[in-house]
């Protein structure tokens, strides 16, 4: 399950800072929220997403069906009709959330690696509110033509692509 709680004493006891707070109090609350956010993203497992099997993998038979030799049957069906990829794989419920980190949330051009927490965050929104699985993909490329080529090459994997936080006009 993709849920967690922020257990910051400040947030639980005092709520959000009011507009009437002194600047010292606001800074203290901001620092406490920052620390709570860092802990939220780090514990108990770093990040906000994971990959979980949808099939039982309890014994040798399950493993043989999931991989070799059983996996050959759906592969052959997809060769016959590529639309079968939606029938036999997660593709139909899998979206790529892709960014190069050039225009992130008011943070600006922070690059692909630093944008990863934001893309994971977008992924958990897809999962929580639409039950859609997401892979976040951060690409170290700013040339628009190369970026398009990279993203287009990923098409066989995903049922959808969400471009996120790519600066204009490159995002168009």
Predicted regions located by residue number:
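N-terminal ligand-binding/catalytic initiation module
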Residues: 20-172
């Amino acid at each position: 399950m993709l849920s967690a709680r922020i257990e910051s004493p400040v947030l639980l006891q005092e709520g959000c800072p009011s507009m009437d707070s002194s600047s010292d109090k606001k800074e203290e609350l901001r620092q406490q929220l920052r620390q709570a956010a860092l802990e939220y993203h780090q514990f108990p497992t770093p990040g906000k997403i994971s990959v979980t099997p949808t099939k039982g993998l309890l014994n040798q038979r399950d493993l043989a069906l999931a991989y070799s030799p059983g996996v050959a049957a759906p592969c052959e069906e997809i060769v016959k009709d590529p639309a079968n990829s939606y029938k036999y794989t997660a593709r139909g419920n899998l979206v790529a959330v892709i960014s190069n980190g050039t225009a992130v949330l008011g943070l600006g051009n922070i690059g692909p690696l630093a944008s990863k927490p934001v893309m994971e965050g977008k992924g958990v929104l897809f999962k929580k509110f639409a039950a859609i699985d997401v892979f976040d993909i951060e690409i170290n490329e700013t040339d628009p033509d190369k970026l398009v080529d990279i993203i287009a090459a990923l098409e066989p994997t995903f049922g959808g692509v969400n471009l996120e936080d790519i600066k204009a006009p490159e995002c168009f």
